[in-house]
Amino acid sequence: MDDQPRLMHSHPGVGMAGHPSLSQHMQDGTGANEGEGGRKQDIGDILQQIMTITDQSLDEAQARKHALNCHRMKPALFNVLCEIKEKTVLSIRGAQEEEPADPQLMRLDNMLLAEGVAGPEKGGGSAAAAAAAAASGGAGADNSAEHSDYRAKLSQIRQIYHTELEKYEQACNEFTTHVMNLLREQSRTRPISPKEIERMVSIIHRKFSSIQMQLKQSTCEAVMILRSRFLDARRKRRNFNKQATEILNEYFYSHLSNPYPSEEAKEELAKKCAITVSQVSNWFGNKRIRYKKNIGKFQEEANIYAAKTAVNATNVSVHGSQANSPSTPSSAGGYPSPCYQSDRRIQ
C-alpha cells in the first residue's frame, strides 16, 4: 500500500493525465477546434471563389461548370436545393396571378387601327387612304393635292411605326430567348420549373411593354398633329367659290367707307353665297385686317370693283330709262286722244 504513492510520485508524467478516457476527451476537444477552424476556412474559400466568379474567363467558367456537374455530390446538392425551394415556393405560390391587359395600351391600339397606321397592311395602302377620306369628310377635285400630301405623310408615319415596332419586337425576342436559355442552363444546377420560366418571360414582356407604349403614344400624337394640320385646319380656312368671293368683294368695296355690314345685310349675303352668317362675319373681319395692312396692294382690286360697280349702275339706269320712256306712235293712229269729261278732267 505504501508503494502506490511512491510509484505515483516517482512517475510525475503518469496520473490524471494518464487516464485513458480523459486523454481521449482532451484529444477530441482539440480535434473539434481544429474541425471548426477547418470549416471556417472552407466557407471562406467558397466565398472567395464566389467573389471571383465575375473575373473568370469563359473557359474557366466552363471548366468549373463541368467539374460541378461531374461531382459525385451533385445529386445530393440538387435534392437539398429542391427541398429548400419547395418550402419557399409554398409561401408565395398564391401571390402569383396574371395581370389584366393595360387599358391605355388597348386604347392606343384601337386608335392606331382606326387611323390606318396599325394592322397587317404595311406601306400606307387602302387603309390609310380610307382613314384620310373619312377624316376629310369627303374631298372634291380642288383638294386632291392636299389629300395626296396627307396620305403620303400618313404613309410615312406608318412606315416609321412599323420599322420601330419590328426593332422593338426583335430586341424583345432576342432578350427573352437569352434569358430562357440562361434559365434552362441554370436548371441543371438549381431547380427551375417550366412555369417559373414562363413567369419570367411575362415579366420581361411587361418591362418591354413600356417601350411599346411610348412608341404607340408618340405615333398617335404624330397622327393627331397631321390630322389637325391637313384636315381640321383645311375646314377652317376653306376657300369660298368664285361667285361667293365676287359677291363679298363687291359689297366690301362698295361700302369701303364703312365696311361693316348690318345683320340684315349679312343674312342677305349668306343666302346669296350659300354660306352661314358667321362665315360672312369672319370673312369681313379678315378682309378688313388684310386691307388695312396693305392698302396699296388692294387699291387696284378696289378700282376694279369700283369700275365694275359703275358699269353695273350704268346698265341698270339705261334699262330703267328704256322701261320708263313713252311708247312710240303706232301705225294705226298714233297716240290715243284724251277724253274730256264735263268737269274738264282728263281721263
From Swiss-Prot:
<keyword id="KW-0238">DNA-binding</keyword>
<protein>
    <recommendedName>
        <fullName>Pre-B-cell leukemia transcription factor 1</fullName>
    </recommendedName>
</protein>
<keyword id="KW-0371">Homeobox</keyword>
<dbReference type="GO" id="GO:0014036">
    <property type="term" value="P:neural crest cell fate specification"/>
</dbReference>
<comment type="subunit">
    <text>Forms a heterodimer with meis1; the interaction is necessary for neural fate induction.</text>
</comment>
<keyword id="KW-0539">Nucleus</keyword>
<dbReference type="InterPro" id="IPR009057">
    <property type="entry name" value="Homeodomain-like_sf"/>
</dbReference>
<dbReference type="InterPro" id="IPR001356">
    <property type="entry name" value="HD"/>
</dbReference>
<dbReference type="GO" id="GO:0045893">
    <property type="term" value="P:positive regulation of DNA-templated transcription"/>
</dbReference>
<dbReference type="InterPro" id="IPR017970">
    <property type="entry name" value="Homeobox_CS"/>
</dbReference>
<keyword id="KW-0217">Developmental protein</keyword>
<dbReference type="GO" id="GO:0043565">
    <property type="term" value="F:sequence-specific DNA binding"/>
</dbReference>
<feature type="region of interest" description="PBC-B">
    <location>
        <begin position="127"/>
        <end position="232"/>
    </location>
</feature>
<feature type="region of interest" description="PBC-A">
    <location>
        <begin position="45"/>
        <end position="124"/>
    </location>
</feature>
<feature type="DNA-binding region" description="Homeobox; TALE-type">
    <location>
        <begin position="233"/>
        <end position="295"/>
    </location>
</feature>
<keyword id="KW-0805">Transcription regulation</keyword>
<dbReference type="Pfam" id="PF03792">
    <property type="entry name" value="PBC"/>
</dbReference>
<dbReference type="GO" id="GO:0045944">
    <property type="term" value="P:positive regulation of transcription by RNA polymerase II"/>
</dbReference>
<comment type="similarity">
    <text>Belongs to the TALE/PBX homeobox family.</text>
</comment>
<feature type="region of interest" description="Disordered">
    <location>
        <begin position="1"/>
        <end position="40"/>
    </location>
</feature>
<dbReference type="GO" id="GO:0005634">
    <property type="term" value="C:nucleus"/>
</dbReference>
<dbReference type="Pfam" id="PF05920">
    <property type="entry name" value="Homeobox_KN"/>
</dbReference>
<keyword id="KW-0804">Transcription</keyword>
<dbReference type="GO" id="GO:0005667">
    <property type="term" value="C:transcription regulator complex"/>
</dbReference>
<keyword id="KW-0221">Differentiation</keyword>
<dbReference type="InterPro" id="IPR005542">
    <property type="entry name" value="PBX_PBC_dom"/>
</dbReference>
<comment type="function">
    <text>Acts as a transcriptional activator in complex with isoform 2 of meis1, to induce posterior neural and neural crest gene expression, and thereby specify hindbrain and neural crest cell fate. Binds to a highly conserved region in the promoter of the neural crest gene zic3. Required for the nuclear transport or retention of meis1.</text>
</comment>
<keyword id="KW-0524">Neurogenesis</keyword>
<keyword id="KW-0010">Activator</keyword>
<feature type="domain" description="PBC">
    <location>
        <begin position="38"/>
        <end position="232"/>
    </location>
</feature>
<feature type="region of interest" description="Disordered">
    <location>
        <begin position="318"/>
        <end position="347"/>
    </location>
</feature>
<feature type="compositionally biased region" description="Polar residues">
    <location>
        <begin position="318"/>
        <end position="331"/>
    </location>
</feature>
<dbReference type="GO" id="GO:0000981">
    <property type="term" value="F:DNA-binding transcription factor activity, RNA polymerase II-specific"/>
</dbReference>
<dbReference type="InterPro" id="IPR050224">
    <property type="entry name" value="TALE_homeobox"/>
</dbReference>
<dbReference type="InterPro" id="IPR008422">
    <property type="entry name" value="KN_HD"/>
</dbReference>
<dbReference type="GO" id="GO:0007399">
    <property type="term" value="P:nervous system development"/>
</dbReference>
